[in-house]
UniProtKB/Swiss-Prot annotation:
The protein's enzyme class: hydrolase
Gene: NPH1
Helicase ATP-binding domain location: 48-213
Protein name according to UniProt: Nucleoside triphosphatase I
InterPro entries xref list: Helicase_ATP-bd (IPR014001), Helicase_C-like (IPR001650), NPHI_C (IPR013676), P-loop_NTPase (IPR027417), SNF2_N (IPR000330)
EC nos: 3.6.1.15
Domain of life, source organism: Viruses
Record's subunit section: Monomer. Interacts (via C-terminus) with RAP94 (via N-terminus). Interacts with the cap-specific mRNA (nucleoside-2'-O-)-methyltransferase.
Annotated region described as Binding to the cap-specific mRNA (nucleoside-2'-O-)-methyltransferase, given as residue ranges: 468-534
Biological process according to GO: DNA-templated transcription
Record keywords, A-Z: ATP-binding, DNA-binding, Hydrolase, Nucleotide-binding, Transcription, Virion
Amino acid sequence: MFALDSIVGKHINYALDKTQHLPNKINNSITNTEITLQDYQYFASRIFIGLKNLNSMLLFWDTGTGKTLTAVYIIKYIKELFPRWIILIFIKKSLYIDPWLNTISSYISDTSNIKFIYYDSTSSLDKKFNNIYRSIESSLNKKNRLLIIIDEVHKLISRSVKKDNNERNFTPIYRKLIKLANYENNKILCMSATPITNNIAEFNNLIGLLRPNVMNIKEEYINNGKLINFKEVRETLLGICSYKRLIEADSLTDTNYIDGYAKKSIFYHNIIMSDEQSKLYNMAERYDYKTELGGLKTMRRLISSFAFYDLKIKGDLDNVEYNEMIKRKLAEFSEFTKNINFSKAFINAFKNNEIKSKTDLLITDINNYNILYQYSCKYIEACRIILNSRGKVLLFEPLVNFEGISSLKYYFNCFNISYIEYSSKTIKMRDNDLNEYNNYENNDGNKIKVCIFSYAGSEGISFKCINDIIILDMPWNESELKQIIGRSIRLNSHEYLPINYRYVNVHFIISYSNNRKSVDKEMLDIIKNKQGKINVVFDLLKASSIETIHNMHKYIEPVDNEIIFEIIRKTRMKEMNISNVIINLKLYPITYCKDYDRATILKGFLNKDTNIIYDNDTPVAKLIVDNNNLPIFVIENDILIYITNDYY
C-alpha cells in the first residue's frame, strides 16, 4: 500500500513545485478587494491544476468551506495548464445568481467560455445540454479542452441510479458526461459536503463519473462497519478527492464550538397527538398501505403535521376534488384563527409548560389552545420552542401547502411570532426578506424571529446568527439533514454574537399517535440505518484523499514526470469473490413480527451485537428498543415475540 502511496505523494509534490508561482489571493474586481484563499483551498487548486493526468477530483468539503470560490479560482488559473478551455457548470437552477454568477462575475473578467446547465430543469437538460454536447463533441481537439464542474454532485448522481432495475431518465446524460469528462485531456471537478446520500449504488456511479470502469463495490463487502477489501479499493481511488470536514460527526451527534463553527446540540421532543389527530393518522396509515406510493408514507406525514377536523383522507377523490377540499378547509381554519390572540399571561404559562397548574388563565385562551392542539401537536410544540429561544429560529417544513407552511403560519399569528417564509411560493420576495432576516440589527431576532424554509432554502443559502433550528418533517437521508442543519452552522456564521451565544440547538419533533405509532420515528430510523454504510464510504474517501497522502509523504522528493494517474485510471480492481470470505457471526433463533403487521409471526436469527435479524444470511429486520436500549416484545400463547422494523 505504502509503495503506491509514496508514488502518489511524489506526484502531489511535483504539482506543488509546478504551481508555486500561483497566487494564494484572488481579486474581486467589483469591490476592488483581495480574498486570501484558505490553505486547503489553495492546496487542492494547485494539485488539480498542476497534474495534467489527474483529470478528476471530488471536493469533499463541509458546507460553508468555500467550494464555489475554489472552483472559480480553478477556472481563473487553469489556463496555466492549457490556454483554451470550455467551462461547463452543472448546478441547481436556484443557485445560478447566488452564489455562482455573482462569484464568477466578481473574479473573472471574460466569461464567454462558461456555460451553465441546470440539472433540476428538464428543459435545460434535454435541450440545452444535448445541443452543447453536440457542439463540444465536434470541437474537442487540440485547440480546446473541457472543464466540467458539478455542484452538489450527489443531486446529479442520485438521478442516475436505477430504481426497481429500471433506467432513470437522467442515465443517458450521465453516460455523455462520462464520455466528455474522460476524453483525452479534459477535466471534471465535483463538489459536495455529502457525496453519497442513500446507498452504495450512488457511490459506484460517483466513481464511474470520476474514474470509469475501475471498480464496483457491493454492499456485502461492508460487514460490521468495515470494508472487507479496504486496501484494494483505496489503492484504486488514491488521490480521487480533497477532504475537508472540520466536524466529522453526523447530523445526529452533538458537537462543540470549533474553528468558527457554532456548537451543536440535539434535542428530541416526543409528543402525543390528540385523539382527533390520532384517529386521522390511523386512517392515513391504512390509506398509505393500500396505495402504490405507500412506501413514501405520504398521508401519514401530512397528518402528523396538521389534521383539521373532518379532513378527508384523499381516498377516491381525484386531484382537483382533493385540492378544492384542501382550499375550503384552509379557508375555514383561517377564519377560525382570525380572532385568536393569546394574552401575555397565557403565553408565559404556555412557554413554561404551566397551563394545567395555572388557575387564573382566561377560559377562551384555554379553549382556543385545546382546539389548536387538537389539529397539530407538532405546531404547538414548535411555537413553545420558538418562544423559549433567546435568538433567531430556523424552521424546516418541506410541506408548502395546506398541511404545512400555510397552516403553520396561522399558529404563529396566534402566538404573536414574527416570521418570513423562504419557499417555492415566495420567489419574488424571499431574497429581500432573507436580507432583512440576516441583517445585523436582527441578530437576536428582535425584528423577525423565525424563518420558515422548505427544500428551496435547504442548499446554497446562508443564515446568520441562528440559535435554534426546528425539523418538523424528516428528510429521507442524513445528507439532506446535514444540508438543512448546515444552513444554520457555517464558517463564522455566529461571529457577531457573544461567545456564549455561538450555538445552535437542533430540535426534532417526533409525534406519536395515542397508540404509539410514529412516522417521524420510522423516518429517523431510516436515516440512521442508511448512514452506517455511508460512513464506511466516507472513511474510505478520507483515506484516499490528497490531504491524507500528502500528510504521510510531505517531504518526499517529487517525480520528474507524471505517470501514476494515467496508470491508476486504467487499472480495474479485481472483483472480490465474497463466497471466499468467511464471516463468523453468532446468531440466535428468534420469533418476531413487524411493528406495522403484528398479525404475521416470523422466525429468524438474531445478532445480539447489532440487533439485526437474518433469514438465510440476509438481514431482514431490526429489533425496536426502548429508551433503556432494551428490546420491545409481546407474549402471545406463551411465545415471546419481538417487535421489529424493516431492515433498510
